[in-house]
Structures are given as C-alpha cells and as structure tokens.
Amino acid sequence: MARARKGALVQCDPSIKALILQIDAKMSDIVLEELDDTHLLVNPSKVEFVKHELNRLLSKNIYNPMDEEENQ
C-alpha cells in the first residue's frame, strides 16, 4: 500500500546532501526520506532552517585571502 507524506522536494548535489544529513543527525526531524543520490524529501517547516544552516556551514569553509592580510 502506498503512503503519502507532505514534504518539500530538495534537489542538490551529493556533497550538499551529506551536509543536510549531518544537520538532520543533530535535529532528527528534518529529512523525511532519502529518495536517491540527489533528492531528499524534507519537512516543509524546516526548509528555511536548512537553508540558514547550510549557509552557516558553507561560510565557515570559504577561503578569503583578505583575512590573511588583515592578520599580518
């Protein structure tokens, strides 16, 4: 029997999917279903939170050469 779930379909590359799953591991109510390598079904009320957390995580990993110049 098929089951229906309300969710937001997220399409992303595998590296972003891994980050979303990492966020979900801490909260455990974000990802409803892993569909394949590039698609997730996400709780619609958590989409903005996921975007915010992804931006925060990705901004920590950005190299900015201006930061080095300021520290010297």
Curated annotation (Swiss-Prot):
Recorded coiled-coil stretches: none
InterPro entries per record: TFB5-like_sf (IPR035935), TFIIH_TTDA/Tfb5 (IPR009400)
Subcellular location, record wording: Nucleus
Entry keyword Flavoprotein: no
Primary location class: nucleus
GO CC term (a single one): nucleus
Biological process, per Gene Ontology: nucleotide-excision repair; nucleotide-excision repair, preincision complex assembly; transcription by RNA polymerase II; transcription initiation at RNA polymerase II promoter
Signal sequence interval, chain numbering: none
Name of one Pfam family that matches: Tfb5
Entry keywords, A to Z: DNA damage, DNA repair, Nucleus, Transcription, Transcription regulation
Keyword NADP assigned: no
Highest taxon listed in the record's lineage: Eukaryota
Role summary: Component of the general transcription and DNA repair factor IIH (TFIIH) core complex, which is involved in general and transcription-coupled nucleotide excision repair (NER) of damaged DNA and, when complexed to TFIIK, in RNA transcription by RNA polymerase II. In NER, TFIIH acts by opening DNA around the lesion to allow the excision of the damaged oligonucleotide and its replacement by a new DNA fragment. In transcription, TFIIH has an essential role in transcription initiation.
Subunit (UniProt): Component of the 7-subunit TFIIH core complex composed of XPB/SSL2, XPD/RAD3, SSL1, TFB1, TFB2, TFB4 and TFB5, which is active in NER. The core complex associates with the 3-subunit CTD-kinase module TFIIK composed of CCL1, KIN28 and TFB3 to form the 10-subunit holoenzyme (holo-TFIIH) active in transcription. An additionnal subunit, TFB6, plays a role in the dissociation of the SSL2 helicase from TFIIH after transcription initiation. Interacts with TFB2.
Protein family according to the UniProt entry: Belongs to the TFB5 family.
PANTHER family associated with the record: GENERAL TRANSCRIPTION FACTOR IIH SUBUNIT 5 (PTHR28580:SF1)
Protein name (Swiss-Prot/TrEMBL): General transcription and DNA repair factor IIH subunit TFB5
